Structure formats: C-alpha cells, structure tokens
Design a protein with these regions (language model features):
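Conserved AMP-binding/adenylate-forming core of the ANL superfamily
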Residues: 37, 58, 62-114, 134-144, ...
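Gly/Ser/Thr-rich phosphate-binding loop
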Residues: 287-289, 307, 315-319, 329-400, ...
Length: 619
C-alpha cells in the first residue's frame, strides 16, 4: 500500500476485542491471562458428531474428490454417524479400546475421518501417523518407533499396496489390518466389510464412558528434535480449545454474518498434526460445517488442485502456510474469476508455520480490496502438539508477525531467559505428559506445572499488552558470535527467506562462535526448473544463474541491516534436499535449524575455510 494512502476498513472479525490481565512477579516473570471466560463446548467430539447428525442428518459433512473421475463425493452428517457406529463395533470386535489404539498410516480422506471418529467413540485412541514415515522413508525407523510406542490393535491404510513394505517392516502379526482396497491377502480385511458390521449396544455403552480424561488420539511431535514423541490428546483438551474459541466468538459484530449460511472449510493440512485435525476438522464438526478435503498442496505440482477446489467451494475460511498464500496471490492476481470465487464467502484468512511477509500481506489486502472493497482479517494461531492452540489473533491487526493473545482458559507465563522472554503455558488443553516418558515429562514442566515450549515472545508494546505478542524465535536456536553478540535465528532466518522469495525454499543460519554469521540455502524447486529450462537443460549454467541471483538478493538484504547480528557474510547453496529420515525436515515442511547445522558440519566448516572454498559466495 502506498505510504499515506487511506485504506478501506476491514471486514469485521466476528470475535471479541482483547481484554487481558497481566501480573508481574519477582524476577521479571509475567503472567498473561484473558479476562474472557471459555464459551460453550461439546462433551466430546464423538458426542458432537452425533448431535450434529441429529440436528441436520442430510447436511453435507465431508466432500472428497473421486481420484478416478474428479467428481466430488459427499458424505452427510447422518451417514457419518451410521458409518462410525458400524466401524466402532467392528473395532470393539477386533479388541480395540482405551489400551489398544487404532493406527492410521494413510493421509486425509473421508474413510480416514470415519476411522478416527469411530475409534474415539469406543475410547480407542486414534493414532494418525505422518505419511512420509511410510512412503518417503527408506529405513522406517520413525514408523517403527511410533508403532512400538502406542502398540495398536488395528491398522488402517487406505490403499494397501503403497504401504505394503512399511507394514511388513512392523511387528504387526497380532494387529488387525484393513484397507479400502482388496489386498490379495486373507489377513487384510476391507473397509466396506467393516462398515457392514451391525452396531450393538456396546458402542453406546463405550461412548457413555467417555469424559475429559479419555484419550482421543496419540499425536506425535514432528520429530524435529529427535524421534517423534507420543502426545496423549484427550477429549477434554480438544473440547477445551473449542470452548476457548467460543469464549471469543461474537458473530453479531459482523453485520454480514448469516446464521443460515453453512460454513465451507477447504483444508489440506495433515490430520497427524493439531492444525488440520484438532483445530480445523474438529472445529468444522462443532460449527456444522461442510469440510472439503483439499487434494492439493503448496507445491508446484499440486497447487493447481487447490485452485480448482477453491473455484468449486468458495470457502468461508482458509488457512495454510505462507508459501501457499504466496502461490494463491500469484494466481488471483492473474485470474479475476478465481479472485471472485475465493472472496465470495471469505470471513478471514489464516496462516501458520512461518512468518507472513509484509509484501505478501499487502498483496493479499490489495486483492481483498479489489474483490470486496474492504480489507480482510489475516489471523494466526500459535500452539504445539503438546498444548493445542494457545494464542490467537482475534482482532483486525494492521501488522504481520503477531501470534495474538491467549485463548480463554489459558495462562501464559513469560520467564526472562537472557535477553528474551521464554513462553510457558498452563490450561485445560495442555497434555498430561508424553506417553510412558516420566523423565522427559519432568524436563518439560516447570515447578508450577507450566509446559515449557522452548519459544520466546515479545510484546508489541509492553505498556499496551492488548496489542498482542510477537514470536521471538526458539530459545535454543540462537547463538553468539565470537564477539559475544547474540544472533536471533528465529527472526533473522524467516526475514532472510522472505527477502529472497521466491528463489529459495528455506535457509539455515550458521556462525556459532565465529566472527560472522553465514547462510546455507535450498533453491525453490519451481525456480530451479525454470532456470534449467531457460538454460536449455544445462543444469550447471542454471545453478550459476541462481547463485548470482540469490547473492544479489542477499546483498540487498544486508544493505538494510547495519548490525553484525543481522548481516550474513557468506552463502552456500545446498544441493542435497533436507532429509526426513535424518529429521532435518518434517512433513509440515519445518526445517530443523540445529539438526541441519550439526548434520552438515563439514559444509559449515567449508563456509568458514580460508581461502574461500569453491561454491561459497562472499557477500
């Protein structure tokens, strides 16, 4: 937006204004608590499903594209109740229960949703596993670790053949295995066979025993700091997050709110993480929404599917990673029909997983103004597998980078840690502790019972805390240069990546105990493919062009950074992609800064070698 330009108003966000209480303790610790009380919430998620099925049995609940025809297939709330009752009975017959989970190896689908909800109905924890552990791994070590941790009674893989090797790597002889497709093995049953099971009173009896302490899922941490850790996610934790959001809800604030409009949610985020499963999917059930399963992803090969799906459903809310929003902005700037479809019902845009750049924020607002005449609220929620959602931006923010303020029911404890404020949290959505990990649990909870996230935050304005909190990096990722100057990786890294967009996929910052900071970057696959095409297939020439371009952007970044803690003096382009087996990257696309630096110590040494090594660029 041009400086001094008068901007149109926001579409009003249907949420209450910030109202928090801040208490200071001895030693500089700050406690932050919202004054709003939690709102309504369901008894459990399965109870919520059954209630919605009774209220509107014929309303579309799930929509998923048939991979063969490309046509949308619809499952109603009433059908979902019937199917989950039948599957729940089948799981009981197979011996599933509170101590015998149901493991899901395949990704988001209507059938996977039914399996997850059916398991919860009988108190059997659902354990959705990151798909790359089965399909992208070569040693299956993380998959075997997850299997050994939860000891499932039942395993589901939608298509058996792609998962055959992964399942064979498990000690699964005692497990019941089923798939949507005939597997050619007598021991593997079909999904349709289980759906044909006649439910008995045992399902209702098991469901009646569910309470806040019932474990709904085992969600595994992303493995970005070692092997994935199993997090018991209770019904109480999931429903408390719904209650926290309801405590902020104020539909009357939006004069255009139509209570008869069925919300449309379009989402690709994997259900083995809280954002896709506990925030978006559970929230859709609570709101009686229609959940469109997005078969696209923010990659050059798959994002067109997301664009096509937006045209079909005109979602009322849309949340994704900033990289996907950048791709969407590119598409909408070139296509007014897509622009109109996207903003037709849109009430807010959400993002997470990385910082949204000022440039992308401005582009999205310009598109919103073009389509609607107003700006759109762009919000985010901050949390972790262990805590569910902790904070949310619940007002029309004029800036990016905020993580918001705590949800009703949650209390933040901000503890001085060097020059930063380390964030800790307590509340009903925080896990009771990792499964069978007493030593680890003793490490992650402090003396007051607050969970320690390892992140740092800062106030936008400490004199006006209602303006919100800003993410200030990981406490353990920051390092000192030889001069004693601290380098804040958590802010430098995303700022550099944003400045170099769209050339790079990600970057890591090196320099601990060195005289200066340096950077290693991964090229964007789409950009490199374009450079190779321009170079007539000459990959070496394409790499030189890329290196020259990224060096130019890096020098421009340095020009605006006067301090040594923010200036990068050398650059190396990485050719080996981040390894999921080694834990360098998760299925969410999060790159583990510390692990990459440790695993590629030889490259770090090369960056700092004298004279300048081949491939290293002096900035």
């Amino acid at each position: 937006m041009a400086e001094g330009q008068t901007l149109p108003p926001f579409r009003l966000l249907p949420m209450k204004a910030p109202d928090i209480e801040m208490t200071r303790a001895e030693g500089g610790t700050i406690y932050v608590t919202p004054r709003q009380a939690p709102g309504d919430r369901p008894k459990t998620v399965p109870h919520c499903l059954d209630e919605r099925a009774a209220e509107h049995p014929d309303r579309p609940f799930l929509r998923e594209k048939d991979p063969a025809t490309g046509e949308w297939q619809t499952l109603t709330y009433g059908e979902a109740k019937s199917i989950t009752d039948s599957l729940a009975q089948a799981f009981l017959d197979m011996g599933a229960g509170p101590d015998a989970p149901v493991m899901i190896l395949s990704g988001n689908s209507t059938r996977a949703a039914m399996v997850i909800l059916a398991a919860q109905k009988i108190g059997a924890p659902a354990a959705p596993i990151s798909v790359p552990y089965s399909l992208m791994s070569t040693d299956y070590e993380k998959l075997k670790h997850c299997f050994a941790a939860v000891k499932p009674a039942v395993i589901f893989a939608e298509q058996y053949e792609p998962f055959r090797k992964a399942i064979s790597a498990l000690n699964s002889d005692a497990c019941h295995i089923f798939s949507a497709e005939p597997a050619g093995e007598n021991s593997v049953r079909t999904y349709d066979d289980l759906v044909a099971t006649e439910p008995t009173d045992a399902v209702a009896s098991a469901m009646a025993k569910l309470d806040d302490g019932s474990i709904a899922k085992y969600l595994f941490t992303s493995g970005s700091t070692g092997m994935p850790k199993p997090v018991p996610t209770t019904q109480g934790a999931m429903c408390a997050m719904i209650g926290g959001q309801e405590g902020l809800r104020d539909d009357a604030r939006d004069p255009e709110y139509d209570p008869d409009l069925i919300p449309n949610v379009l989402d690709w985020l994997p259900w083995n993480h809280i954002s896709g499963s506990n925030v978006n999917f559970n929230g859709a059930i609570w709101n009686g929404a229609t959940f469109w399963i997005d078969d696209g992803k923010p990659t050059p090969a798959l994002f067109q599917r997301t664009i096509d799906n937006i045209r079909d459903c005109s979602p009322s809310s849309f949340g994704t990673a900033p990289i996907a929003l950048a791709m969407l902005a590119d598409a909408m700037e070139a296509d007014d029909t897509l622009l109109a479809a996207f903003f037709k019902n849109m009430r807010s845009i959400g993002y997470g997983g990385a910082t949204l750049s000022d440039d992308l924020y401005d582009r999205l607002q310009a598109l919103a103004i073009k389509a609607t005449g107003r700006r759109i609220p762009i919000i985010t929620m901050y949390g972790a597998t262990e805590t569910q959602g902790i904070t949310v931006v619940h007002w029309e923010a004029e800036r990016v980078g905020l993580i918001g303020l705590p949800l009703p029911g949650m209390t933040l404890k901000l503890v001085p840690n060097g020059a930063k404020l380390e964030v800790r949290v307590k509340g009903p959505s925080v896990m009771p502790g990792y499964l069978n990990s007493p030593a680890k649990n003793a490490e992650v909870f402090d003396e007051e019972g607050y969970y320690c996230l390892g992140d740092a935050v800062t106030f936008v304005d400490e004199n006006h805390p209602e303006k919100g909190l800003v993410f200030d990096g990981r406490v353990g990722e920051d390092f000192k240069l030889s001069s004693g100057t601290w380098v804040s990786v958590g802010t430098l890294r995303p700022d550099f990546v944003a400045a170099c967009s769209p050339l790079i996929f990600d970057a890591v910052i090196a320099g601990q105990d060195k005289d200066y900071a340096a950077v290693m970057v991964w090229p964007s696959q789409a950009v490199m493919e374009q450079y190779v095409k321009i170079a007539g297939g000459d990959k070496a020439r394409a790499m030189k062009t890329f290196t020259d371009e990224i060096a130019h952007k890096a020098r421009a970044f340095n020009a605006g950074e006067p301090g040594s803690s923010r200036r990068l003096k050398r650059l190396l382009v990485l050719t080996e992609p981040p390894s999921i087996d080694a834990g360098e990257i998760t299925d969410k696309g999060y790159v583990n800064q510390r692990l990459v630096i440790d695993r590629r110590a030889d490259l770090v040494s090369r960056i700092y070698s004298e004279p300048l090594a081949d491939g290293v660029v002096q900035l």
